[in-house]
Amino acid sequence: WIMGHMVDDIAMVDDFLDNGANGLELDISFDSNGKAEYTYHGTPCDCFRSCTRYESFDKYMEYVREISTPGNQKFRKSLIMLIMYLKLNSLYANQLYTAGSDIADQLARHYWKDDGAARAYMVLSLPSITQTEFIRGFKNRMESQGLQKYYAKIGWDFTGNEDLDDIEATYKKLNITEHIWQSDGITNCLNRGTDRLEDAIRRRDKPGNKYINKVYLWSIDKMSSIRDALDKGVDGIMVNYADRFIDVLKESKYSSKYRLATYEDNPWETFRP
């Protein structure tokens, strides 16, 4: 999975897809009432990137609905996943619950409004395990509005590099045992060790594991780092330059072992060689 990083305006959506991404990460900012407002990262952000490009959340979702709907004249079959990084750190518990409810409402209004014709999978990525009120708000609204069928398209991720045992315990409390991506990473401006990443991969591959289906690394720019991550066995990498990942996949060492995921590949299923 090639996940374009910080794809926060519509022009970048097309640029990343043109360069080979099959997944897009967008940063969702909220107002003081817990309502999703913009796709916007802000400063600081990754080195050599503009931190301030943005779009209104509703307009962004309308656009990705069009390009991920078969039969639409704008359809792009390569777009199969959206990774929604939820900028929740400034919200209190009651606002977190509202934010979860609002995301469910806005997805129903702007993305699934054609009775689910738009086909992208979505990973809801939370900064911390302390923000589970968002998940409760999201699930309660989905169920009260009869939107449970869309759970098949929803996955989960905690992206704050927290202890993996604590993350597992959180999923147990939430009764979430599937559709789990586990991230590990840091801004491309800094180096990070790989111990936690390797531990996540071991847990993913452990027989009987219920709490990690896929593992991805963020955010990587160097081709040598992409190779190293593939050698370790990640399922996806979040990148600023998707074409570099494509070039690595063309190398003989990797072309015989890896291929770009397609819509027919289940993003919630652990790959077993």
Curated annotation (Swiss-Prot):
Domain of life: Eukaryota
Subcellular location: Secreted
Disulfide bond entries: 45-51, 47-189
Catalytic activity: an N-(acyl)-sphingosylphosphocholine = an N-(acyl)-sphingosyl-1,3-cyclic phosphate + choline; an N-(acyl)-sphingosylphosphoethanolamine = an N-(acyl)-sphingosyl-1,3-cyclic phosphate + ethanolamine; a 1-acyl-sn-glycero-3-phosphocholine = a 1-acyl-sn-glycero-2,3-cyclic phosphate + choline; a 1-acyl-sn-glycero-3-phosphoethanolamine = a 1-acyl-sn-glycero-2,3-cyclic phosphate + ethanolamine
Entry annotated with the keyword Magnesium: yes
One GO term (biological process): killing of cells of another organism
E.C. no: 4.6.1.-
Tissue-specificity statement: Expressed by the venom gland.
Cofactor: Mg(2+)
Keywords: Cytolysis, Dermonecrotic toxin, Disulfide bond, Hemolysis, Lipid degradation, Lipid metabolism, Lyase, Magnesium, Metal-binding, Secreted, Toxin
InterPro entries membership: PLC-like_Pdiesterase_TIM-brl
Keyword DNA repair: no
UniProt-annotated catalytic positions: 5, 41
GO cellular component terms, semicolon-separated: extracellular region
UniProt similarity note: Belongs to the arthropod phospholipase D family. Class II subfamily.
Described function: Dermonecrotic toxins cleave the phosphodiester linkage between the phosphate and headgroup of certain phospholipids (sphingolipid and lysolipid substrates), forming an alcohol (often choline) and a cyclic phosphate. This toxin acts on sphingomyelin (SM). It may also act on ceramide phosphoethanolamine (CPE), lysophosphatidylcholine (LPC) and lysophosphatidylethanolamine (LPE), but not on lysophosphatidylserine (LPS), and lysophosphatidylglycerol (LPG). It acts by transphosphatidylation, releasing exclusively cyclic phosphate products as second products.
Protein name: Dermonecrotic toxin SdSicTox-betaIF1
